[in-house]
Amino acid sequence: MCIRDRVGTDLQAILTFADKDGEPIIAKVGLSLVSVDNARKNLAEEVKDFNFDAVCAAARNDWEQALSSITVEGGGTDDLKNFYTAIYHAMVVPNVVSDVNGEYRRHNMQIGQLPKGKMQYSTFSLWDTFRAWNPLMTLIDTALVNNMVNSYLDIYDASGELPIWPLSAAETGTMIGYHSVSVIADAYLKGIRGCLLYTSPSPRDGATS
C-alpha cells in the first residue's frame, strides 16, 4: 500500500484491514526529512528482516548497552530506579535527522551530504540542557558531542546563526540566550575536538556580533 501526497487542511485518513479478532496489525514506517525514496532506504536498511519480536529484543539490547555506560554503587532499589530512569530520559534526545546514505536537510532547505560515519542531529533544547545535560554528555558520550557540535556548525553555515532551539531542519527561536556557544566551549576545554569548529572563527564572530 502506498499513500499518495495530499495537500489541504483538516485532512483525515481511515485505514481498514482484513484482520481477524485479536490478530496484531504490524506497520513498518520509514521517515526522512529529504525524500520519500530516502525514507524507503532508511526502512530497508534499519529493519532489514522485519520481525516485531526481534525488533523489540534488539531495542531492549540497545537500551541495556546504553544504560550500562554508567555504573553506580550503593543506594537502594528506588535510588537505582530513579537514577537509571533519569539516564534513560537523558538519552531520548537529540534525534538523528540524517539518512542512511548520509543525506540530510540543512537549515537553508538544501540537501547536505555527510562523510561516512557522521550523523546530523536536531532537537536541541539548549536553554534547558546547557547547564547539566550537555556537560554530562561530555563525560559519557564524546562521539555524540562531536556529532552535535558539527551539527551546530552546519546550522551556522546554512543559516548564519548557531542554534537556539532547532527542530528537524528549522530554528524555532524558542527561549532566550545563545547557549550553543557555551556548549561548544565546554567541549573544547575538555579536549573533545573532533569537529570542524577549530578551522573557522565564524561561530565566535556570531556570538559577539
Where are the language model's segments positioned?
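Alpha-helical support elements that line or immediately flank enzyme active sites
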Residues: 85-98, 122-145, 185-191
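Conserved small/polar residues in nucleotide/adenosyl-binding loops
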Residues: 1-5, 198-203
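Short, solvent-exposed loop/turn and secondary-structure capping segments
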Residues: 40, 96-103, 135-138, 146-149, ...
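Secondary-structure capping and boundary motifs in well-ordered enzyme cores
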Residues: 78-79, 119-128, 173-180
